[in-house]
Amino acid sequence: MKARSPQTTIKPDYRQFRLCKLNTLEFSHIKLLLFWPAFGLAFLALERFRLHAAYHVMHCALDDVIPFSEWALIPYLLWFVYLIGALTYTFFRNVPAFRRMMRFVIVTYTAATVVYFIYPTQQLLRPEAFAHDNALTRAVAWFYTFDTNTNVCPSLHVIGSAAAL
């Protein structure tokens, strides 16, 4: 019997999944999901425990002419839907594509995290006060409480978008 390569199209029946089957060809791609908690812990360490790091400010002249718009929150949130949607779709519908996407994410997000540890960056683009008081500006203010303006280059949003393509 010919051995199948990981790229062979296998449609897993997730109803049959048991932990003892995690190393089988049908379900081994599930282990790639372990990257997300590991990345989350590494990013948390970067964001919360490097409070006194010397950050390199990322800035260009174009930054000075782009006005703040609370409406930008909507495409920002849709980016998460885009990335999670692409991962979910490929996980259930196209396992070889899921494996490729996750390998790309693992390599590039890990490389970005190493860069952040070695060369911390930040942007100083946030307004001191919002021009309007509405639901979107309150949501942006809430996001600012946990989504810092640090570790911005290389951009995980750009990397994630490329992965989802």
Functional labels for PLM-detected ranges:
Residues K2-L83, E128-A131, V140:
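N-terminal transmembrane-helix/juxtamembrane module of multi-pass inner/ER membrane proteins
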Residues A42-A45, G85-F92, V115:
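Residue-level signal for alpha-helical transmembrane segments in multi-pass membrane proteins
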Residues R50-D63, F91-L165:
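Membrane-interface loops
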